[in-house]
A protein has these predicted regions:
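Primarily the internal scaffold of c-type cytochrome electron-transfer domains
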Residues: 1, 14-234
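N-terminal export/assembly segments and adjacent metallocofactor-ligating motifs
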Residues: 3-13
């Protein structure tokens, strides 16, 4: 465990560790995350600013992976430079929820949002990593009764207690759909698979569910509450 192999690739720009010479002779273009870390060198990035590369720019540092080659820059193929960790134990729970520190990209790949074409920058400002909107306003930009034309499946009235089942206690979308785990006592990571709570899977496999993060009546009780509100099939 050292800076050259564990830290430098994501905290510097165009890192060349120099292992081919039998030791460390680390070189880099910038000792921080500069423009070229995501956009590539010089003029080349201005010739293609299309959106499909958005997640590719984020994935190398926001995923649990092993590096197999140096010099990655979009639009290069991610898998030519990195081997992502598989979404299995002990890094993930049996249903795919994050368990260990996996830096969220692996969970996002499991989501319906990813399958529908949502990218990191739809929710996160790429140059600050801040959310594009705060609280539920972020989700309700698409999940409303007049969704963007490219996300028609988001149609619905979700900002109501008939959906979230909590008429009195205020909750946010992420409380149910992006439960968090805390690493190193200070680092909160929200599961980006954006799944619905499944107490039934908790009963079957011992996996966590968002309901039981707040309610202490048990997984069987939580499952019955969901059936009562939404029916046995959704």
């Amino acid at each position: 465990f050292n800076w050259n192999r564990q830290c430098a690739d994501c905290h510097s720009t165009n890192v060349q560790v120099g292992l081919a010479k039998g030791g460390y002779e680390t070189r880099f273009d910038a000792h921080n995350v500069a423009c070229e870390a995501c956009h590539g060198a010089g003029l080349s990035h201005t010739n293609d600013t299309s959106k499909p590369y958005a997640d590719v720019a984020c994935a190398p540092c926001h995923s649990r992976r092993s590096q197999i080659a140096e010099g990655f820059q979009p639009p290069n193929q991610l898998l030519d430079y990195y081997v992502p960790a598989p979404t299995v134990g002990p890094l993930y729970f049996d249903d795919g929820q994050i368990r260990d520190e996996v830096f969220v990209y692996g969970s996002f790949l499991q989501s319906r949002m990813h399958m529908a074409g949502v990218t990191c920058s739809d929710c996160h400002a790429p140059h600050s990593a801040r959310l594009q909107s705060s609280g539920d306003a972020l989700c309700l930009r698409c999940h409303n009764e007049s969704p963007p034309i490219n996300f028609k499946d988001a149609l619905g009235d979700f900002d109501t207690s008939l959906h979230h089942m909590h008429p009195v206690t205020p909750i946010e979308c992420i409380d149910c759909h992006m439960p968090k785990r805390t690493y190193m006592q200070i680092d909160d990571r929200h599961d980006h698979s954006l799944r619905v709570p499944r107490p039934d899977l908790s009963i079957q496999y011992g996996t966590p569910n968002a309901c039981s993060n707040c309610h202490d009546q048990g997984d069987e009780w939580a499952m019955q509450q969901i059936i009562q509100y939404h029916g046995s099939r959704r």
